Amino acid sequence: MQGIAVSGLAPSESSRYTFLMKPLPHDGPALLGPDDPPTFEVINREGGAHILLVCDHASREVPKSLNHLGLGAEAFERHIAYDIGAAAVTRGLVERLDAQAVLAGYSRLVIDVNRPPGHPESIVPENDSIPVPGNQNLTDEARRQRVRELFEPYHDSVNRALARLWNRGPAPAIFSVHSFSPYFGDKSRPWDIGVLWNRDPRIAIPLMEHL
C-alpha cells in the first residue's frame, strides 16, 4: 500500500482539455526522438479553481536513446522510478476541484525535476542500493542535456501555469502531489497521508485540521 504526500505552497481560455508538449529543437544530437512521449502534460488549463497541482514524479518513462538506463523492467515497477499512484491521485483532484495540473513526463531516474540541477540527487548513480548504469560516469554535457530537454520544459510549463493563475486573481495555492512507500530502508512509514511544508504553514495547517 502506498501513502500519499501533499506539499502545499502559498506563493508571495474555458474548456477541459490536455496539452502535451515537447521542447524546441536545439543544435547537437537530441536526447528525445520523435517516438518519445512529451516532457510534461498540462491538464484542465482553464480550470476554475485558483489552484495549481503539480506531480513531479508522475511517470516512469525513459527516452529511448537511454535504453532504459541499463535497468530491467522490474526496476520501473518500483517506487525508485516514479511515485506510484500519484498521477492518478492528481487526475482525481483535477476532477474534484476543477484545478489545473502539470505532470512531469519522465522518470525521476532520468532526472529528478524535484531537485535543482547539480544537486547530488538530481541524477543518481544508484537508488535504494540499486545501481543505475545509465547514470554513471556522465559527462557534463550529458547532464546539461537532461536539464535542457526534460527539467527546463517541465518547470517552464509550471511557471506558465502559475502566471495564468496570477493574471486571473489573487495568489494561487500550489499543491505538489507525491506518494511514498511503506518502508524507507528498514524504517517503517505507517501513515496513509502526509502533509509537508517548509516555512509557510498557511495552507498546510488548515488542511491537516480538515483531514
List each model region and its residues.
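N-terminal amphipathic/basic-hydrophobic helices that include classical n-h-c signal peptides
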Residues: M1-L20
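N-terminal catalytic or cofactor-binding beta/alpha core of small enzyme domains
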Residues: Y17-I174, S179-L211
